[in-house]
């Protein structure tokens, strides 16, 4: 959810995803400054709510200032607020925008850099209370550390984390996965296509307007971008062998990198949804998977 989107097309994309068997719809208040949740809510009017796992997030605030500035989005200053009051208010408002009486998963979007300001115990207790009330079904956290994961489990529970993970961004393998396995926390990966870089459509000559988030993405810097393009070019024979797109190949491999990984793929149009869905039926031969993982390891 960034840049220009056609709302009707977005609703159609969500409907297409559910028709194709996609069950998890993820959004957040910060995406489009509430607009994403409103669009998802419109789509849910035409979808059997029981068919989908619906997740959204809390903890980012732009109606009032807090001591923790997160970033500026489209000229609006966004702050982090992990207080119990903010979390509970966020959920009540998200439920209204989404037109539902419960969330299947609630994530804290970003964690507080100062636990003295927003004690983790207070944050978790608020989420546990919402779960007891039936307003959320599972507790999630995004952009965490191993210590934060342990803190959630100490003060209540943590069902799932949502972290950036791709063939180019693999920090969670060593930093978070051991803790998640120990404590039984599931993992959902966002940005598996690295903002489009791993679709095979980006070249060294591709440029983006000022302010585009890709310009600050380390994977888009010249050296790393060249590695990514060379990696994908080396798999041209595999896209031919499996009759698939580069994006489908990358999604299929990403899902195999971590057992039980939930791969969250963004899509603006029904066509992009269908391309993503095609990765589900792609079964990589053992030798091909080993080869591709070796290629990925060689640039890590």
Name each model-derived stretch.
Residues 1-2, 57-77, 107:
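N-terminal small/glycine-rich loop or linker at the start of catalytic domains
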Residues 4-17, 83-97, 145-151:
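Short, acidic/polar
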Residues 9-11, 111-300:
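Beta/alpha (TIM)-barrel catalytic core signal, keyed to glycine-rich beta->alpha loops juxtaposed to Asp/Glu
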Residues 25, 103, 139:
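Glycine-centered flexible beta-alpha turn that most often forms the glycine-rich phosphate-binding loop
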Residues 1-53:
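N-terminal binding-site loop/beta-alpha segment at the start of enzyme catalytic domains
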Residues 1-7, 72-88, 114-116:
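Active-site mouth loops of central-metabolism enzymes
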Residues 95-114:
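Active-site groove signature of glycoside hydrolases
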Residues 19, 43-49, 96-99, 152-156:
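Acidic (Asp/Glu)-rich catalytic clusters
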């Amino acid at each position: 959810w960034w840049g220009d989107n056609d709302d009707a097309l977005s609703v159609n994309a969500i409907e297409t995803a559910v028709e194709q068997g996609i069950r998890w719809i993820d959004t957040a208040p910060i995406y489009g400054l509430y607009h994403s949740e409103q669009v998802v809510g419109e789509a849910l009017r035409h979808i059997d709510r029981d068919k989908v796992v619906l997740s959204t997030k809390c903890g980012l605030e732009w109606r009032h200032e807090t001591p923790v500035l997160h970033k500026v989005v489209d000229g609006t200053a966004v702050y982090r607020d992990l207080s119990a009051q903010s979390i509970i208010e966020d959920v009540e408002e998200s439920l209204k925008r989404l037109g539902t009486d419960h969330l299947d998963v609630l994530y804290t979007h970003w964690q507080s850099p100062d636990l003295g300001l927003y004690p983790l115990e207070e944050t978790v207790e608020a989420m546990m209370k919402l779960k007891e009330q039936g307003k959320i079904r599972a507790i999630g956290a995004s952009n965490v550390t191993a210590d934060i994961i342990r803190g959630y489990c100490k003060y209540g529970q943590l069902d799932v984390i949502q972290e950036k993970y791709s063939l180019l961004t693999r920090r969670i393998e060593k930093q978070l996965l051991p803790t998640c396995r120990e404590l039984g926390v599931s993992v959902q990966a966002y940005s598996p296509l690295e903002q489009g870089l791993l679709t095979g459509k980006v070249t060294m000559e591709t440029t983006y307007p000022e302010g585009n988030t890709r310009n600050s993405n380390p994977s888009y810097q010249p050296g790393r971008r060249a590695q990514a393009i060379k990696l994908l070019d080396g798999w041209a024979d595999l896209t031919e062998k499996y009759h698939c797109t580069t994006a489908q190949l990358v999604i299929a491999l990403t899902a195999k990198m971590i057992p039980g990984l939930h791969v969250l793929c963004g899509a603006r149009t029904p066509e992009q949804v269908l391309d993503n869905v095609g990765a589900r039926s792609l079964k990589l031969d053992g030798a091909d998977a080993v080869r591709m993982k070796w290629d990925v390891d060689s640039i890590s």
